[in-house]
Amino acid sequence: MSTNLPNSCLVQIALTVSTHSGPQLIYHYPPSNYATATNSKKTHHPDIKKRYEYTDSENNSSSDDYSSGLSDSELSTDYADCSSDASESSLDSLPQSNHEDTVNSSTNNTFINNGLRSRQSQISANKLFQVLNQNNNNVAINGENSLRESLHSIRTSTNMSSTTDPRPEDELDAVDEELKILVDDLLDGSIFQQDTFQDISKVLNFNTEFVAELCSPRKEMCNTRFEFTVDDLCFLGLPIHADHKGRWKKSKKRKQASKRSARSSTARNSISRNSVGRNSIGRNRSKTESQGHINDVEEPADDENSDYEPSKSEMLNEMYCVPDAENDEFESLQQSINMFQVCFIMNPKIIEYNERVDDMYHYVVTRLSLILRYIQGKTGYVTRECVKIMKCKDEVSKHSRYYESLKSPWSKGKYMYERILYESSLARALTKCFNCIHNNEIANLEIDGDKIVSLQIPIKNEFSILPNLKEDAVLRGSFLSSILNESFIGRSTSLTNEDSDNLYANHDRLLDYGLLLLDEPENIIKGLENASFDNGVTDLLLINLVRQLKPTIRLGQYKLLIKELIDSNDSSYDDQFCETTLKSLCLHLIYWRHARLILPISSRNTYIVSPLAPISGFSTDDFKHGEYDTLIRQQEVPVNNNDEPSLIYQNKKVFNEKFPSLPSLPSFLQLMSTQKPRPFGHIIPSNEHKSMYLNALAWLMRYGYLTQLLTFVYVRVDKRIKIAVDEDLEKDNLRSNKHEKSGNFVTGGENYNSSEFDDLEMINDNDFTIILEPERNTALEKRWLYKCAEALPTDLQTLFRQVVKYFNGKVSLEYIMIKEGIPKNEIKRLLQALGKYIVEVKHW
């Protein structure tokens, strides 16, 4: 069992749709066979990911016939009439009804797909210039009639095969280099090899018709969790189905109207019997919601006032488009799609099945499906992209001479995927999603041009309880702490009301902590700049916050920095806005694994060597040797062929370079490993060395060598306190009895008090009682607590009432001092005064 290790168990991702003519498999990735998909080695971090370069061994000889020796820079985009970015954005912004009739079906595909050929497939220079000359002559024709004629000629050239050139004109035009690089990065060359490639007509040895039928459930099974197992594979998804009116999602206005009608029908039902039908509809709706359907899941608000203004090029494309039978077929197909599903195919172990599948569903499947449903309801994005993919497949398989000239099936498969990825942004998003989730990275997907969604399965590298390393290994350098960052992020897609309240409460406590960067600030800033999506304000705030962050300072003190960066003179940016912005930035750094929350580092705190410190092993991901060290040594097999030192000695070199004047890493850890833990300030020689030692402490906590030792407190009530409270209750009871006798009537209070005293007699038999929840204590427990502090001075009694709610064994004293602003000496005085009524627990 290895549930603590990052392993998504994802082997393939598939997009299916359901139409009036039946289900269809639109796209799946990767096209690898069953053996490769289920037995491939998983990489867990980008630093150990290996990149493969594809080489077509069987096609090298044939490629020499039309190789000109021209470099990629010479085959530039100088002859392109318009950029691919502009063309693709114009396609996505066209109305759905006219989208498939536009000029993109021929002309846009011609220059888009040129740059996706392999380097061995470059044609000769003479043929290139001939084609470019012919294209220039066609482009030079002006006027409305000439444009129509050029469109007809291009469509004709697409449908007719050329006898002089193995690659038609539509595969020679210039391409966008950035998009070409993006597609090259998305495709894994190791998949398109003879021993790993699976024919695109099959999905993991299953026929595409079977997978399409399996992943297209009927309407009653849609809009809820879909989970189906075939052999060792799990098909997991969230199928989205349109209603009988073709709506993909109920708008908020329709929801409110339906709720009002349901309430009114219920009210009328009390005075009339003519509303039985309405009541039955209301009962059916409530039954559907109780079954776990997602129609009321909160999604982005609708843009009611958004006005669409097409550009001139889009208007020309729509004006001069020439419909044909093929476009009519795809347009009718687009209009007939009533269901789509992004299905994640997994192969988890039986013992890990529930946890792996639940994590995938909660963190990835639900979020991706909901954002696609929202965009589909707004713009018809999913159906439009499905038609793009199907048209691209049809054009390549039927009209591409270069595709027919390829000999090996894996070469054809790679070329087909290149063309699809270049055409469809949804295919690129699904491919990137698979690559990132498969490698346990964060998938930052751009959907429909302006929608960004980040998906990840959190890596388990933090524990509040020491795991059993013999049964379940963990990553080297995992954090051992009671401050779990996951509790501040939470499962946003599966929060119950109670969990949601706890999550918001954690957000309120967020600014009381410090933030420890998990990498050098320069590296984090570089990563933020590469992952930015032209949001200048957010990038500015994040970069400046990363530069100023220090683990010794509370996050709440950075509100002034946010004010200065935004606009300190603008009255609209109040303290609440700056605080909310600061929380969002901190949560962003935590979610993207750039930082983690800790209590602010101080020389007064106590730190110990973590039991999970990365001492052995050869890398952070080298959990295999941690599990099988003994077995490997018994077999006398070398555990490392490169003769690399273990992690402690690798980090020793880095530590010495960063802190040359401090003791070596093993010596420093030896200083921290005392028999009785002491505050960190005891090992600091002088105040001049304090800053350097605190920086070293932050470095050691970043790599999991040290963890903070916290103090938790319980209140213990002994038998003497119980007897004293019991006597007070008896006195109060006697007074109440005298008052009742003078009134000549008896109430039910005597029976209640007598039963209470019977319970007290049973409780008094115990020596002591620990109050687990002083904030939610009963009346009797409250008397016990006040009795414990009755003999204290007045100032300590006030302090006790202020902090007793935290004495539940869950909130550390170190956090109490930060939260309430209480000096450490005052807390120490209070604990000494309470004496035997306090139970202290040391824990990380």
UniProtKB/Swiss-Prot annotation:
Keywords: Meiosis, Signal. Pfam families: HTH_NPRL3 (PF24064), NPR3 (PF03666). GO terms for biological process: cellular response to amino acid starvation; meiotic cell cycle; negative regulation of TORC1 signaling; positive regulation of autophagy; TORC1 signaling. It comes from the Eukaryota. Residues 246-262 have a biased composition (Basic residues). Residues 1-21 form the signal peptide. GO terms for cellular component: GATOR1 complex. Residues 297-307 have a biased composition (Acidic residues). Residues 103-113, 274-293 have a biased composition (Polar residues). Residues 57-94, 263-273 have a biased composition (Low complexity). Residues 53-113, 246-310 are annotated as: Disordered. Belongs to the NPR3 family. Mediates inactivation of the TORC1 complex in response to amino acid starvation. Required for meiotic nuclear division. This is Nitrogen permease regulator 3. It comes from Kluyveromyces lactis (strain ATCC 8585 / CBS 2359 / DSM 70799 / NBRC 1267 / NRRL Y-1140 / WM37) (Yeast). The gene is NPR3.
